[in-house]
Amino acid sequence: FEKRIELDDKYLFKISQKVKNNSNSSIDLFPYAQMTRNKIPDDIQNFYIQHEGFIGVFDDELKEDDYDDVQEKKIVRESNEGWLGITDKYWMTAFVPETGKNFKSTFLYEDGFKANYIINKPTTITRSSSGINELRLFVAAKEVETIDGYAENQNIKKFDLVIDWGWFYFFTKPLFFVIDYLFKISGNFGTAIVLLTIAIRLIFFPLANFSFRSMAKMKAVQPEMMRLKELHKDDKVKLQQEMM
C-alpha cells in the first residue's frame, strides 16, 4: 500500500492511493474518505443569506444541510460527479471524488459531525497487479479568486457556489468583482465604495435627469391645473376636456 500526498500553494491536496495485489486472487476495493467536525462552532450564524454546515454539489445540483438537520437523521445522496464538504463563514473543507465515478455521500452525526463518500463500483485488482485511486481535498479560506481558479482549472463543477452569493448571485458576484477591482486601484475599500457609488450615479444619471425634467414640467403646469379645477369645480366633464 502506498499513499502519495501533493499540496499546491493554495491548499488543494491531491491524494493518490496505490495498492499492489501480491496475492494469488483478485481483490475488490471500495475507495472511501471521511472528514469529521467534533462540535458546532460557537459563533455560528445561520442567516438565510449565509449557510454554515454541510454542503455539496451532486450532479449539478447544490445541496446545503444545517447541523440540526444532520443531527436529526443522516442524509444520503448518490451522484456521478460533484463534491461535498463542511463550510464555515470564511473557511471550507471539501472532498472532490474522481470525475465519472458514481459515489454515495453521507452526512451524519455519530460522535461528531461527519461527511463521507464511498465509490459504489469497486476497483478490482487482479493478482500481481496494482490499482490507483485519486482524491482531491480542499482545505482553505474561501477566497473568490482561488475558488474560481480551481473551478475552472480543476474542472470542479459549480465549485464557486462554495461562496454564498445569495439569491441574487447574477448581480452580487459581478458587483464584488467591480468593488475588488476598484480596491486594487485605490488601495482602500472605503474609497472603492465611494467610486462605485459615483459610477452607479453616472450610469443612472440620464434616467434621473429625465425624472427631474418631468417633475419640473409638472410643477410648471400646476398653477394652471389648480385654476381649471377652481373654475370648473361643478362640471367634471368640462374640467376633463380642459385638462386634456
For each predicted feature, which ranges?
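Soluble non-transmembrane domains of integral membrane proteins
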Residues: 1-158
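Membrane-interface amphipathic helices and adjacent TM-edge segments
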Residues: 17, 202-244
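Surface-exposed helix-capping loop/turn segments at secondary-structure junctions
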Residues: 25, 187-188, 233-235
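Cytosolic juxtamembrane amphipathic/interface segments immediately preceding
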Residues: 119, 178, 243-244
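Conserved hydrophobic/aromatic pocket- or pore-lining residues that grip, position, or stack substrates
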Residues: 128, 182, 201, 225
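Interfacial loop/helix-cap signal at membrane boundaries in integral membrane proteins
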Residues: 140-192
